Amino acid sequence: MKVAISGGGTGGHVYPALALIRELKKIHPEAEFLYIGTEKGLEAGIVKREGIPFEAIEITGFKRSLSLENIKTVMRFLSGAKKSKQILRDFKPDVVIGTGGYVCGPVVYAAAKLKIPTLIHEQNSVAGLTNKFLSRYTDKVAICFEEVSDSFASEKIVFTGNPRASEVVGVDSEGALETYGLVSGKPTVLVFGGSRGARGVNEAVEAILPEWNNRDFQLLYVTGDVHYEKIKDSLAELNLGNHISVQPFIYDMPKILNAVTLVVSRAGATTLAELTALGVPSILIPSPYVTANHQENNARALEKNNAAIVITEAELKNTDLMATVDSILNDEAKLNGMKLSAKQMGRPDAAAKLVEAVLSIMK
C-alpha cells in the first residue's frame, strides 16, 4: 500500500496529516508514505524529523482579492501540478490525501487528473480556498465541523473529525504538572497562544497576574518562545507564588492537556479537536489574523454548544478575564456542564474514521 499526503504552511495542516500516517501504520505496517510539501513551509522540518520521505514543489497561495500576484500564482500552480504528476508517476500511490494549505492544491489536482483516488480533509468551520477548489475533483471531503458542509457537495462529505484528537486521548498525565513546578490534583488553568505565542493573549494575562497571585488554583502560562524573555523580565518584580509557572513552550502538550482543568487559548482547529476529545472547558480568544476569520467561527461552534466562552481580541481590553476564569472554576455545576458539552462534541475516534474514509475510496 502506497500513500501520498500533502498539506502545509501551518501546523494545523501538518499535524493532522502525521496523525493520519500514524493511524494508517497501525493497520498497514507495511505501507509506504510520501509527503509532498514546500521547502519554505513548516512541513519541511517537521516531516523530515519524523523520517517520512519528503518531496518539495514550489507554490504560493492565492490572494482573496484581485491581484497581479495571482497571475504568477496560476503559473506556479501549473508548474507545481506538472512536477506533482511526475512525482506521483514515480511513486505510484494507491491514494492521495490533501490536508489543506495551498501546497496540496497542485498535488491533489494532479492526482485527480491521473485518476488516482483522492480525499481532502478540512479542519476548520470555514472552508479554505484550496479545499474549495479541490473539492470539485476529489472523491471524498472529510470535515470536522458541520458548519462547513454547505461549502462542499453533500455526496462527497464524510464527517470524521480531526485525527489529532485521537492522539491526546488516553495519554498518561502522571508527573506532567510537576515537570513545570506545579502540583498534581489541584485545579489548574493552562494559558497558551499557539506555538509562537500571541501578544494580545499575553498582555491580557500579564494584566491579571497580580490578582492570580491571590487565587488557590494553579496557572501554567505559556508565553511562546519569542515573547518569553521580555515577559520574564517584566514579571520579575511581581514575586509570583509557586502556583504560577511561566514557560516559553510546552513540548509534552498531550500530557498537559490531560492534567489541566481549564484552557485559555486561541481557537485553531487542532487545539479545539484536542480539547473536545478530552472534554476540557475553555475560554477561547480567536486570532483575528487568520483567513476568513475562521478561528472565531471555530470558537463559536463550541460556544453554541456550551463547551467554551468566547472573547474576541477586540473585547479583551474591556473584559475582566480573571472574573471569567473565576466564574467557571468557582461554579462546579458550570464547570462540569462545560466538560460534558465539550466531551459530547469530541471525536476521539477521528483518526480511525479518517482511515476508514481513505480505505473506502481505494481501488
Swiss-Prot record:
Catalysed reactions, as listed in the record: di-trans,octa-cis-undecaprenyl diphospho-N-acetyl-alpha-D-muramoyl-L-alanyl-D-glutamyl-meso-2,6-diaminopimeloyl-D-alanyl-D-alanine + UDP-N-acetyl-alpha-D-glucosamine = di-trans,octa-cis-undecaprenyl diphospho-[N-acetyl-alpha-D-glucosaminyl-(1->4)]-N-acetyl-alpha-D-muramoyl-L-alanyl-D-glutamyl-meso-2,6-diaminopimeloyl-D-alanyl-D-alanine + UDP + H(+)
A single MF term (Gene Ontology): UDP-N-acetyl-D-glucosamine:N-acetylmuramoyl-L-alanyl-D-glutamyl-meso-2,6-diaminopimelyl-D-alanyl-D-alanine-diphosphoundecaprenol 4-beta-N-acetylglucosaminlytransferase activity
Enzyme superclass (EC): transferase
Compartments (UniProt record): Cell membrane
Topology with respect to the bilayer: Peripheral membrane protein
Enzyme Commission number(s): 2.4.1.227
Family per record: Belongs to the glycosyltransferase 28 family. MurG subfamily.
Protein name from the UniProt record: UDP-N-acetylglucosamine--N-acetylmuramyl-(pentapeptide) pyrophosphoryl-undecaprenol N-acetylglucosamine transferase
